[in-house]
Every structure is written in C-alpha cells, then in structure tokens.
C-alpha cells in the first residue's frame, strides 16, 4: 500500500484521468473531492461491498431459479 501525506487543497493524481483532492480536514474527518471520467464508478468502500453482496445474492437467486425451472421441464 502506498501511503501519502497531503494538506488541504493538495491532490493525488492516479493515471491521466483521476485526481483526488483534499478539500477539508475537520477533526478526524477528511473531505475528498474526486475528479474522474463518468464511466469510472466511485463508491465508499462499505457501499461497494454492499453492492457486491447484493449482486452475488441476485446471481445465486437467478441460478437457483433457472435450475428449478429446468428440472420442471424434464
């Protein structure tokens, strides 16, 4: 893991298209601004993990449904 220190209004550049800027530091909370192309999905990690979990449940449900339907046709 790369660890960098930044002050307010300083940025980190990721490739040519993504910039992460420190907007404010208030107590233990850091506010970040992220500029990235529209096709890049950006989520807080807990939201991203929730999306992955929901997608896995949906795939599992669809697989079970397909197996159930295919066994009924036989």
UniProtKB/Swiss-Prot annotation:
Q: Name one GO biological process term.
A: regulation of carbohydrate metabolic process
What InterPro entries does UniProt report for this protein, alphabetically? CsrA (IPR003751), CsrA_sf (IPR036107)
Q: Which GO terms describe its molecular function?
A: mRNA 5'-UTR binding
Give UniProt keywords alphabetically: Bacterial flagellum biogenesis, Cytoplasm, Repressor, RNA-binding, Translation regulation
Taken from the UniProt entry, a GO cellular component term is: cytosol
Localization per Swiss-Prot or TrEMBL: Cytoplasm
Which SUPFAM superfamilies does this chain map to?
Answer: CsrA-like (SSF117130)
**Matching PANTHER family, A to Z?**
CARBON STORAGE REGULATOR
Question: How does the record describe its quaternary structure?
Answer: Homodimer; the beta-strands of each monomer intercalate to form a hydrophobic core, while the alpha-helices form wings that extend away from the core.
Q: What family is this?
A: Belongs to the CsrA/RsmA family.
What is this protein for, i.e. what is its function?
Answer: A translational regulator that binds mRNA to regulate translation initiation and/or mRNA stability. Usually binds in the 5'-UTR at or near the Shine-Dalgarno sequence preventing ribosome-binding, thus repressing translation. Its main target seems to be the major flagellin gene, while its function is anatagonized by FliW.
Name of the protein described by the UniProt record: Translational regulator CsrA
